[in-house]
Amino acid sequence: MDIIFYHPTFDTQWWIEALRKAIPQARVRAWKSGDNDSADYALVWHPPVEMLAGRDLKAVFALGAGVDSILSKLQAHPEMLKPSVPLFRLEDTGMGEQMQEYAVSQVLHWFRRFDDYRIQQNSSHWQPLPEYHREDFTIGILGAGVLGSKVAQSLQTWRFPLRCWSRTRKSWPGVQSFAGREELSAFLSQCRVLINLLPNTPETVGIINQQLLEKLPDGAYLLNLARGVHVVEDDLLAALDSGKVKGAMLDVFNREPLPPESPLWQHPRVTITPHVAAITRPAEAVEYISRTIAQLEKGERLCGQVDRARGY
């Protein structure tokens, strides 16, 4: 069994050694331009077209939760990956836990009005504020996949009203489910906090725009943990300036790194993190990949395979 590995920033040698240990029968090598030798599996992140084109692979693993970088290249270069080759993404591998930590900490930050107290502190102003009531602080999760379900589970501990929206209806205990474009407005109407965990597909690009934001309650909050292309940044800034949106926590952006001249940096109601909400944990990823390869070798049916038509 031959495995090729490519990631522009990961410690390649660590991964190769870990994979060799986890899959002793495998010959693992770092792919470099010009390497056209045979391979059974490819582990990749933002791979060059030449790495995958023409190969008879058993599967490709994207080394992250998203596969948009591969699918976008496939649109321009359909020869990059044969339609018969299964494409897998890292469904969790520790990312769910990280998303839970990020989402819960920020929801509680807003619920306890720490954002307002920070602004008061900046002007040396001492003034207790009325508390928010939990029953009126509905959390809406936009995108109900694996990570969305993890975030919902963690927020249930705090007894917030929860709802989710996705392409198809979900049956999550304690979570009100909305499905399809026809139910999006009803979903948004009660969301004091909107958490975006949508996949990056042509249908979801620019979905968080002026029209969507206007359907939220006045003074709502936005937490974007998915992709920057989901948000029309000028529309969000306008909603923040008008007070329609009271605050935004943004981990992803249309351009990354976020340019220094972006007005988001200096906006008093925006908090920025540099795409760190959920990073790939190497040891857990290696365990998932080795287990999945073993199942593929046995011909078993698996979860986590990407539907290329849907984009996730």
From Swiss-Prot:
Active site: 227, 275
Keyword Oxidoreductase: yes
Classification via InterPro entries: D-isomer_DH_CS, D-isomer_DH_NAD-bd, GhrA_Enterobacterales, NAD(P)-bd_dom_sf
Function: Catalyzes the NADPH-dependent reduction of glyoxylate and hydroxypyruvate into glycolate and glycerate, respectively.
Organism listed in the record: Escherichia coli O1:K1 / APEC
Pfam families: 2-Hacid_dh_C
One term under GO cellular component: cytosol
Catalytic reaction annotation: glycolate + NADP(+) = glyoxylate + NADPH + H(+); (R)-glycerate + NAD(+) = 3-hydroxypyruvate + NADH + H(+); (R)-glycerate + NADP(+) = 3-hydroxypyruvate + NADPH + H(+)
Subcellular location: Cytoplasm
Gene for this chain: ghrA
PROSITE patterns referenced in this protein's UniProt entry, alphabetically: D_2_HYDROXYACID_DH_3
Protein name: Glyoxylate/hydroxypyruvate reductase A
GO MF terms held by the record: glyoxylate reductase (NADPH) activity; hydroxypyruvate reductase (NADH) activity; hydroxypyruvate reductase (NADPH) activity; NAD binding
Family of the protein in this entry: Belongs to the D-isomer specific 2-hydroxyacid dehydrogenase family. GhrA subfamily.
Documented EC number(s): 1.1.1.79, 1.1.1.81
Location, primary (coarse class): cytoplasm
Entry keywords, A to Z: Cytoplasm, NAD, NADP, Oxidoreductase
